[in-house]
Amino acid sequence: YRQTMKTICYIIPYFGKLPKNFQIYLLSCAQNPTVNWKILTDDRTPYEFPTNVHVQYCNYEEVKQRIKAWFDFETVIDRPWRLSLFKPAYGEIFAEELSGYDFWGHCDIDLMWGNIRTFYSENNLNKYERLGFLGHSTLYKNTPEVNARYKRIVPGEINYKDVFSGRSNYSF
């Protein structure tokens, strides 16, 4: 009896020119064939995408409108970098793209991946609902409860509505 490996997908909206070292980043993704990446971008540079990296060509305005439509209050997404403030909500916003995965995550695209499964082992994936917290690589268990946790209000603390509707740069 062999337990099925938990599925992982990182979602990365990125608009504008991808970094110079992006092809190297893709090579490091290719070294992790049991992990998928979904990149939403308007950069049509003909990179050699490995089979586990899926590109959805779209523009910043489309993703911005998708995010704005998700919330019942005014959000501020006046520059592409502000998309990063919404990372904890990607599990809900991009639920269609993440459907069927056990875990979803967000990550930076200037990482050079080693063997992801060494740290994100089956033992850790079975034990935790969130792994990582600094944003360069964070995974969340793909369940409605976990995907909605960013909405928890902690009295006296800045909450998601403050972050998503404010003009300051936050992290939470």
Q: Residue locations for each model-derived region?
A:
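Short, polar loop motifs at secondary-structure junctions
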Residues: 40-46
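Short, acidic, metal-binding catalytic loop of nucleotide-sugar glycosyltransferases
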Residues: 24-36
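Short beta-strand-to-loop element that shapes/binds the nucleotide-sugar donor at the catalytic cleft/hinge
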Residues: 128-145
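Active-site-proximal specificity loops/subdomain of glycosyltransferases
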Residues: 46-97
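Catalytic core and acceptor-binding pocket of nucleotide-sugar-dependent glycosyltransferases
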Residues: 148-172
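GT-A fold catalytic core of metal-dependent nucleotide-sugar glycosyltransferases
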Residues: 85-132
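N-proximal low-complexity "stem/linker" segments adjacent to membrane-targeting elements
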Residues: 1-23
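A structural signal for isolated positions on well-ordered beta-strands in alpha/beta enzyme cores
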Residues: 9-11, 36-38, 54
